[in-house]
Regions:
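A solvent-exposed, acidic/Ser-Thr-rich amphipathic alpha-helical stretch
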Residues: 33-90
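Short, cysteine-centered beta-strand-loop-beta hairpins and adjacent loop/turn segments enriched
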Residues: 99-108
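A short hydrophobic beta-strand element
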Residues: 88-98
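Short, low-complexity N-terminal intrinsically disordered segments enriched in polar/charged residues
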Residues: 1-42, 140-141
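Low-complexity, intrinsically disordered terminal/linker segments enriched in charged
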Residues: 2-5, 124-141
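Short, surface-exposed coil-to-beta transition loops
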Residues: 76-78, 107-112
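Hydrophobic pocket/interface hotspot
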Residues: 24, 35-37, 44, 56, ...
Length: 141
């Protein structure tokens, strides 16, 4: 039974789902993408609800790596976050604005995220957002 997990970057103990997802987001923001992926289950389901659903770390890396690589800065501003459960089985939901600085200009869009923690890893990551707003934000860059 997994009750704690170490942050792959700082090696700090993480004992609750809320802190775990917060550290996951911080790792992405700080360009610690490999460390963030260590926090994801090998068979994780990643669902960008209006676009596509993929399964497994490799597929998640394929979806995100190009987009993140094009950004000189990444900020995921969490406005609200709620969590329940523990590191064995927990759920975290957040409302956030994901921001990416691309070619000197910020591209941003609003997200509602759902993370299910199972056995100390993110087993399900689902992001809900407006596809049209996302497309328009990218077109303005």
């Amino acid at each position: 039974m997994v009750s704690v997990r170490l942050d792959p970057v700082t090696q700090q103990v993480i004992s609750d789902p809320d802190h775990f997802v917060t550290k996951f987001i911080e790792n992405i923001e700080q360009s610690h993408f490999t460390a963030a992926m260590e926090m994801v289950a090998d068979d994780c389901e990643y669902d960008n609800v209006p676009i596509t659903k993929v399964f497994g770390k490799e597929a998640i890396v394929n979806i995100l790596s190009g987009f993140l690589a094009s950004a000189s800065k990444v900020e995921w501003l969490v406005h609200h976050q709620v969590a329940s459960g523990d590191m064995q089985h927990g759920v975290v939901m957040n409302e956030r604005t994901d921001r990416f600085e691309i070619d000197g200009r910020w591209v941003e869009f609003d997200i509602a995220g759902l993370f299910v923690i199972s056995d100390g890893k993110i087993a399900l990551w689902r992001d809900y957002f407006d596809k049209e707003a996302f497309t328009k934000a990218l077109a303005k860059k």
